[in-house]
Swiss-Prot record:
Chain's role: Regulatory subunit of serine/threonine-protein phosphatase 4 (PP4).
Descriptive protein name: Serine/threonine-protein phosphatase 4 regulatory subunit 2
GO molecular function annotation: protein phosphatase regulator activity
Bias (Polar residues): 140-149, 160-170, 183-194, 215-228
InterPro entries tied to this protein: PPP4R2 (IPR015267)
Quaternary state and interactors: Serine/threonine-protein phosphatase 4 (PP4) occurs in different assemblies of the catalytic and one or more regulatory subunits.
UniProt region (Disordered), positions on chain: 140-405
Lineage: Eukaryota, Metazoa, Chordata, Craniata, Vertebrata
Length: 405
């Protein structure tokens, strides 16, 4: 449909003093009823639309009089003139094209298509008129790309013509909200704002700081774990020495006799002081006493298994020997306890003195170790003679009852 011809026809209708139906304008209303496209502004065809609406309502009443029966009790009865004035008042108050313009044009061009009674027709028109949302001509929508409409409400861009068409239908209607567009190509933060370069740089710095903080932490953990391992390595030899000492106490007689000679030779080779040699002699004495105790226990067991026949004077001699051996054992135990205490104190002193005497010349150390070695070799011989004599006496006592049998 030609827009220029339409605008000329509308101007001619406004100039006429007597309002009459125009075929061109009726064709325009039919076009809107079919397509919903309004090619001109509301101010231009508002007069003809009101004229056509009033004429259709009057014609509908004359052709279809009011029903003779009683009105519907569930619906409020409103006289025709009152309803007509209400509808015309609402339409004249429009500042823009109502979004129901297509349905209204259908009612104007073909009023009897869906309605037969006048009251129902007026209620249908009133229902489509009582709206506030508005639309704009399709020509403006095609020409201005910045105009956006959602549910009949236009969200403007930067169009200069929007200020003239800012009002919508009805009193107290809120103005459309001007919402800025945000491009989705840029990354969004948690609060909906675009992520800036400063934020990216700060995040990169934070990640780098975390990496640097993690690396020293791992180094410190390694440093902490290494001294713990060193402590365990230092404690292991001490525990091993303790186990070796316990093992030596429970060895057999031959191993107990060979151990003093090996310990003396190792001490001479290492250049230990007098305190270490005295402690080794005390250990030798302890081992000899342990061997003597083992012999005594074996003799007691043999005596317990002897027959009652030999319970005569030989038993008395054996009891005397055992009493003397027990007295010797008690005295030797006391001496061993005292010597062990002295040896521990001497070991502590030697550990302190050995740290301070690390700078002594090697020649003096060798001379002292040779003298102490000779002294140490004499002392085990003397100590070893005493348990040997005790063991010989014990074997003689054990052999006498065997001869009597």
């Amino acid at each position: 449909m030609d827009v220029e011809r339409l605008q000329e026809a509308l101007k001619d209708f406004e100039k006429r003093g007597k309002k009459e139906v125009c075929p061109i304008l009726d064709q325009f209303l039919c076009h809107v009823a079919k397509t919903g496209e309004t090619m001109v502004q509301w101010s231009q065809f508002k007069g003809y639309f009101i004229f056509k609406l009033e004429k259709v309502m009057d014609d509908f009443r004359t052709s279809a009089p009011e029903p003779r029966g009683p009105p519907n009790p569930n619906v409020e009865y409103i006289p025709f003139e009152e309803m007509k004035e209400r509808i015309l008042k609402i339409v004249t108050g429009f500042n823009g094209i109502p979004f129901t313009i297509q349905r209204l044009c259908e009612l104007l061009t073909d009023p009897r298509r869906n309605y037969t009674g006048t009251d129902k027709f007026l209620r249908g028109v009133e229902k489509n008129v009582m709206v506030v949302s508005c639309v704009y001509p399709s020509s403006e929508k095609n020409n201005s790309s910045s105009l956006n409409r959602m549910n009949g409400v236009m969200f403007p861009g930067n169009s200069p013509g929007y200020s003239e068409r800012s009002n919508v239908n009805g009193p107290g209607t809120p103005r459309p909200v001007n919402r800025p567009k945000v491009s989705l190509s840029t990354p969004m933060t948690t609060n909906g704002l675009p992520d800036s370069t400063e934020h990216k740089e700060s995040s990169l710095q934070q990640t780098e700081d975390k990496k640097h903080s993690d690396s020293p932490a791992s180094d410190s953990e390694g440093a902490q774990s290494s001294p713990v391992k060193n402590k365990h390595s230092e404690d292991d030899p001490a525990e091993a020495e303790g186990h070796e000492v316990k093992r030596l106490k429970f060895d057999k007689e031959g191993e107990a006799r060979d151990a003093p000679n090996q310990s003396a030779s190792s001490e001479v080779s290492l250049g230990m002081g007098e305190e270490s040699e005295t402690s080794s002699t005390s250990q030798d004495k302890e081992k000899d006493s342990i061997c003597a105790r083992q012999h005594c226990t074996e003799e007691d067991e043999e005596e317990s298994f002897m027959s009652p026949r030999n319970a005569g004077p030989d038993r008395k001699d054996q009891e005397k020997d055992t009493e003397s051996s027990t007295v010797n054992e008690e005295s030797s135990e006391e001496n061993q306890m005292e010597e062990s205490d002295q040896s521990q104190a001497e070991k502590d002193l030697h550990s302190d003195n050995s740290e301070s005497s690390g700078s002594v010349s090697s020649g003096a150390d060798c001379s002292e170790t040779e003298e102490l070695g000779s002294y140490g070799s004499e002392t085990p011989e003397t100590s070893s003679e005493t348990p040997m004599e005790n063991s010989e006496e014990a074997t003689e006592v054990a052999d006498e009852p065997m001869e009597q049998d």
